[in-house]
């Protein structure tokens, strides 16, 4: 991921709001990069620019050598939000395979990928459970599995453990590091916690 002279200004009734200004950054393949800073400093906005969910006012950003829109079409990244965002009427396995259904994978491939990513996040055997039957931490692991299901190179994570208690968060951080070591994904991780960023990251970006 490469950003050069990236600016993003929002127009509001109270005047312009400069969400990002002169951002220059390189994230290399296999890096685990954490973004920290106070609320409103642009951490989530930058992640949304990577994902093509926000359009910069000026400057350039590329993902695997592609524009953010091209990278999205190429399935270059998975996105994990602070809320797990699981559909309550679908089983855990059904939630994880949803993007695979949308992308047109055949049923055999869907089943194989769901099993593989559930094993990766230590949710083996929970595929027929519904979200309400799982703890908050387990639901978030299912959300991570869903983002991994289509085998994207990059994982974008926006405060994925921010709503969880400290003991659960520490456990999930350990699991995330093991997952990163096994998959060699590139991870961009937004957090408010300096200790969490120090524990997880190969690089920390202060915004």
Residue ranges of each PLM-predicted region?
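Helix-to-loop junction immediately C-terminal to a conserved catalytic motif
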Residues: 51
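Conserved signature/switch motifs of ABC ATPase nucleotide-binding domains
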Residues: 129-132, 150
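Short coil-to-helix segment of the ABC ATPase nucleotide-binding domain corresponding to the Q-loop/switch region
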Residues: 90-97
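Conserved ABC ATPase "signature" region
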Residues: 97, 101, 108-126, 178
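The feature captures the beta-strand-to-loop junction immediately N-terminal to the Walker
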Residues: 36-38
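Conserved ABC transporter NBD signature motif
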Residues: 59-69
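Catalytic Walker B motif of ABC-type/P-loop ATPase nucleotide-binding domains
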Residues: 155-158
């Amino acid at each position: 991921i490469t950003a050069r002279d990236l600016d993003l200004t929002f127009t509001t009734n109270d005047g312009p709001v400069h969400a990002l200004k002169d951002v220059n950054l390189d994230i290399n393949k296999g890096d685990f990069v954490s973004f920290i800073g106070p609320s409103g400093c642009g951490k989530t906005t930058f992640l949304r620019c990577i994902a093509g969910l926000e359009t910069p006012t000026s400057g350039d950003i590329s993902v695997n050598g592609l524009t953010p829109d091209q990278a999205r079409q190429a399935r270059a990244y998975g996105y994990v939000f602070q809320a797990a965002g699981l559909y309550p009427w679908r089983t855990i396995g059904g939630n994880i395979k949803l993007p695979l259904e949308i992308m047109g994978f055949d049923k055999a491939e869907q089943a194989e990928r769901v099993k593989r990513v559930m094993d990766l996040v230590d949710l083996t055997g929970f595929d027929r459970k519904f979200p309400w039957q799982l703890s908050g931490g387990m639901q978030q692991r299912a959300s991570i599995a869903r983002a991994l299901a289509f085998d994207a190179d990059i994982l974008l994570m926006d405060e994925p453990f921010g709503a969880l208690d400290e003991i659960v968060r520490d456990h999930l951080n350990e699991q995330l590091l093991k997952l990163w070591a096994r998959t060699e994904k590139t991870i961009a991780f937004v957090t408010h916690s300096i200790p969490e960023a120090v524990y997880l990251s190969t690089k920390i970006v202060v915004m």
